[in-house]
Amino acid sequence: MTAEDLDLLKRAEDYILAVELTSGEQFFAEIVMVVDQPPTPDVFLLRVLREPDGAFTASTTTGESILLADIARVAPIPGVDYPAEARP
């Protein structure tokens, strides 16, 4: 993940981003918390699905932790209004 992606991830807590893992898996997620500290920098997130009307709904009731090293990139989702602090 680039420094710009990491910066966006940190600013997007409580917002939904597109996430791509180094394995190639892609999904939408609500970013809960980013912990960019040793020994295991990671992000806590909740996977979400986009409904036909554009709304997002949780795809699970439990969140998950993903190591920052396992994230290839993050991006804002087209058509979603982000507040200024969460924009790239």
Region annotations inferred by a language model:
Residues 1-88:
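Conserved RNA-binding domains used in RNP assembly and mRNA/RNA metabolism
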